[in-house]
């Protein structure tokens, strides 16, 4: 049975959920009253034994045992174990519900795809849907206690009308040592193919859709069979059960109220009813009972699935849809809103308060001033920015600056390998001035000539063929005629790696600023090329070789 209380909690009001505590069927009281009575009986029996039977020495020994149990009882991770276990059981329970076979989609397809209002067509449709119901009954009979009690043998299925005598004999001839719940689905598939070959099903697309739905129902039945076969590991269930019961066995001794005259910590009061121990019993033991009830929803508990009702409903609805409702349509008539573009269904007096206007969006409730609705031109926007944004105190606070403002980059320096020792500042300054003179001296020199063409950025040509000149001599080029720039460049190529520092003063005009940026970028490229070329010839001073120039 299934306990339905949805209507009682439809509205969250005062006492709506509290009224559920008065229910008996499916309640925690019905599940726990037996264990609770046993626990209370044992608790007060131990209490009477401690108060009236034991001697003073025995009472002292019992008190030590009670303090020991109460101090170590919290080491049992009962909340941790129960939380994971109940979560696993509830997810498994819901998955089994989702795999319950409902033939509604299949009966709609059979009623519409299988044509013919004659005796043969009617027999074909009823037989197809009866095979589907028979497959569901066979699997539910295998996993549900209530269904098995209703149909204990296959002969009872014949008497109930789910199977004919010929089908019963055909099923017995198979002689398989396995469950035969899958046989009606095979009959359904073969009969559907026969109906297609006989012209009862027009198209292969319709046949494929019918087969897909049958395979879906067969898969759901297989899932239920697998859930019934593969249970939650027994060791997990045993661990949870032992943890809960051992916890409350320790509570029988550890939660006893000791003699308050002996000043034991936590035992200043001598109560008769252990209120919080009883509440803890209801919570933890009820938590375990939830898992015990949901671990197999095909039993006869109050919250188990109504499998017998499902069988009755599926048979009645399916036969009606494929037989009495086949091609039995009501006459088509114009609806009452035929000429209305926006129909307004009426409300009753009880539902008038639930009428609402259409939701247009959250921004439709925003109201703007009249001056905020005026359109601005670009010139007015720029003027307003200059007057109110850049010159105001708030604009300065927010860091708003005009477009023609440039950051005052003074004494912009690029220092490489230069010590910050005060004694060497003069040497660094002289070296920087000398480096700047060298840069301006070779400003017009094309330094890309020392780089092979296939290594230049943007060049896609391969390396040149090896020259016929020896390695010690440079190959002549068109740029090495007379006293050209190549002589000066050779001097640079023999220089060691230098430390270059550029002192750039940014001009105020934008044009000079751009030119200075290009000069800064070119100087940085010059330094990188000099460094790369110097590293590629580490022993040129000793060997006295000259670099090979490429065009």
UniProtKB/Swiss-Prot annotation:
Q: What GO biological process, any one, is recorded here? A: gamma-aminobutyric acid secretion, neurotransmission
Q: How is its activity regulated?
A: Inactivated by sulfhydryl-reactive agents.
Which residue intervals are annotated with compositional bias (Polar residues) in the record?
Answer: 465-475
Q: Which Pfam families does this entry report, sorted A to Z? A: Bestrophin (PF01062)
InterPro entries given for it? Answer: Bestrophin, Bestrophin-like
- Complex and partners: Interacts with YWHAG; this interaction promotes the ligand-gated L-glutamate channel activity leading to the positive regulation of NMDA glutamate receptor activity through the L-glutamate secretion.
This protein is called Bestrophin-1
Upper taxonomic lineage: Eukaryota, Metazoa, Chordata, Craniata, Vertebrata
């Amino acid at each position: 049975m299934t306990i339905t209380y949805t209507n009682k909690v439809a509205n969250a009001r005062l006492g709506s959920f509290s009224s559920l505590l008065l229910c008996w069927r499916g309640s925690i009281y019905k599940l726990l009253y037996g264990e609770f009575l046993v626990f209370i009986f044992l608790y007060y029996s131990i209490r009477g034994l401690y108060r009236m039977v034991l001697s003073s020495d025995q009472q002292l020994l019992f008190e030590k045992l009670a303090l020991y149990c109460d101090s170590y009882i919290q080491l049992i991770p009962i909340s941790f174990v129960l939380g994971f276990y109940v979560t696993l059981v509830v997810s498994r329970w819901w998955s089994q519900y989702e795999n319950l076979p409902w033939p509604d989609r299949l009966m709609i397809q059979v009623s519409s795809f299988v044509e013919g209002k004659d005796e043969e067509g009617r027999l074909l449709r009823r037989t197809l849907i009866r095979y589907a119901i028979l497959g569901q009954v066979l699997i539910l009979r295998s996993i549900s206690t209530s269904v098995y009690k209703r149909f204990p043998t296959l002969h009872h299925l014949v008497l109930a009308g789910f199977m004919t005598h010929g089908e019963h004999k055909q099923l017995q001839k198979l002689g398989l040592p396995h469950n035969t719940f899958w046989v009606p689905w095979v009959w359904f598939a073969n009969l559907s193919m026969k109906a297609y070959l006989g012209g009862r099903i027009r198209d292969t697309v319709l046949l494929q859709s019918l087969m897909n739905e049958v395979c879906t129902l067969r898969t759901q039945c297989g899932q239920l069979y697998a859930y019934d076969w593969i249970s939650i590991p027994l060791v997990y269930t045993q661990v949870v059960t032992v943890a809960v019961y051992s916890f409350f066995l320790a509570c029988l001794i550890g939660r006893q109220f000791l003699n308050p005259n002996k000043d034991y910590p936590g035992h200043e009061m001598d109560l008769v009813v252990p209120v919080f121990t009883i509440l803890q019993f209801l919570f933890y033991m009820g938590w375990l009972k939830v898992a015990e009830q949901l671990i197999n929803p095909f039993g006869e508990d109050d919250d188990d699935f109504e499998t017998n009702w499902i069988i009755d409903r599926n048979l009645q609805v399916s036969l009606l849809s494929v037989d009495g409702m086949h091609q039995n349509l009501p006459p088509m008539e114009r609806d009452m809103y035929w000429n209305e573009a926006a129909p307004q269904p009426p409300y009753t007096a009880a539902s008038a308060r639930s009428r609402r206007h259409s939701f247009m969006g959250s921004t439709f409730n925003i109201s703007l001033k009249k001056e905020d609705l005026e359109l601005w031109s670009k010139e007015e926007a720029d003027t307003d920015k200059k007057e109110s944004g850049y010159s105001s105190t708030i604009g300065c606070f927010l860091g708003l600056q005009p477009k023609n403002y440039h950051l005052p980059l003074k004494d912009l320096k690029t220092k490489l390998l230069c010590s910050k020792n005060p004694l060497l500042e003069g040497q660094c300054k002289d070296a920087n001035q000398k480096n700047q003179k060298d840069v301006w001296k070779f400003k017009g020199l094309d330094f890309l000539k020392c780089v092979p063409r296939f290594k230049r950025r943007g060049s896609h040509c391969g390396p040149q063929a090896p020259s016929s000149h020896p390695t010690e001599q440079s190959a002549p080029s068109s740029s090495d005629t007379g006293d050209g720039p190549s002589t000066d460049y050779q001097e640079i190529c023999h220089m060691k790696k230098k430390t270059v520092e550029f002192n750039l003063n940014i001009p105020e005009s934008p044009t000079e600023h751009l030119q200075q940026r290009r000069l800064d970028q070119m100087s940085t490229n010059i330094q990188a090329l000099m460094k790369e070329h110097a590293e590629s010839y580490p022993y040129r001073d000793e060997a006295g070789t000259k670099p090979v120039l490429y065009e």
